[in-house]
A protein has these predicted regions:
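Conserved beta-sheet core of the metallophosphoesterase superfamily
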Residues: 60, 98-166
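N-terminal active-site segment of His-dependent metallophosphoesterases
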Residues: 1-54, 68-76, 149-150, 184-187, ...
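Helix-adjacent hinge/juxtasegments
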Residues: 60-112
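Active-site environment of divalent metal-dependent phosphoester hydrolases
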Residues: 14-18, 44-49, 66-72, 94-100, ...
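Beta-strand-turn-beta hairpins that frame and shape the catalytic cleft
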Residues: 1-7, 79-88, 128-134, 158-165
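Active-site neighborhood of phospho(di)ester-bond hydrolases with catalytic His/Asp-centered motifs
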Residues: 8-10, 37-43, 60-65, 89-91, ...
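Short secondary-structure boundary/capping segments
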Residues: 29, 51, 77-79, 107, ...
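A short C-terminal boundary segment appended to hydrolase-like catalytic domains
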Residues: 110, 115, 121-130, 162-209
Length: 209
């Protein structure tokens, strides 16, 4: 089936002595292999990370508060249309209970989106609220602001009318446990048809036809 496989990463902080993400292990490279596009939620921190990522696929970045450099692939806000899904990206996206339209007004200047991608917190997040999929892929290198270790990424599979989103753990590193809580969400024609948290299926909303 035609479609786009999109990798989501964010907050790629690296120890000062690390020269490439490969030195943390092969897991991130393996995850990025074969995707069609990479969306980075900001805090690239070190510019060479963008070139490293782009060996796998084109990359688009929402500039983070630690990204004090210019790059044509990076902007404070990004807006993309992929397979009929409108995707907004901004770095500072913190959990809050206000209605999503209020969140979009602040984060995206009121632009309507189907998917809102952010970063900053280093904590994974995946929810469907007020008709919008909200995703924070966490951090692959500094999850939950713990010491440097393997963390989380996310994957979006997009086809017209169908979306599958998943938070993915990169595994454990050097005896350090990964604090990730895996989760996934699947939409068909903007309706949830599957949703899980830490491997447990969640109740689905009831829709009136």
């Amino acid at each position: 089936m035609p479609g786009m496989r999109v990798a989501l990463i964010s907050d790629t902080h690296l120890p000062s002595l690390i020269r490439t993400p490969d030195e943390l292990g092969p897991q991130l490279a393996a995850f990025l292999t074969g995707v069609d596009l990479i969306l980075h939620g900001g805090d690239v921190v070190r510019p060479f990370v963008l070139d490293w990522c782009e060996q796998f696929a084109p990359i688009v970045v929402a500039q983070g508060n630690n990204d004090d450099f210019d790059d044509p692939r990076m902007a404070r806000r990004q807006l993309l249309d992929i397979e009929g899904w409108r995707i907004g990206m901004v770095h500072e996206l913190r959990p809050e209970d206000r209605p999503v339209p209020v969140l979009l007004e602040r984060a995206m200047g009121g632009e309507r989106v189907d998917v809102l991608i952010g970063g900053d917190t280093h904590v994974e997040r995946l929810e469907y609220r007020d008709g919008v999929v909200v995703i924070n892929s966490g951090s692959p290198t500094l999850p939950h602001h713990k010491e440097f270790r393997l963390g989380t990424v996310a994957l979006l599979d997009l086809t017209p009318g169908r979306l599958h989103a998943e938070i993915v753990s990169l595994g454990h590193s050097h005896g350090s446990p990964n604090p990730t809580v895996p989760r996934h969400l699947e939409l068909l024609e903007r309706r949830i048809i599957a949703h899980s948290h830490d491997g447990v299926a969640l109740a689905l909303p009831l829709y009136e036809d």
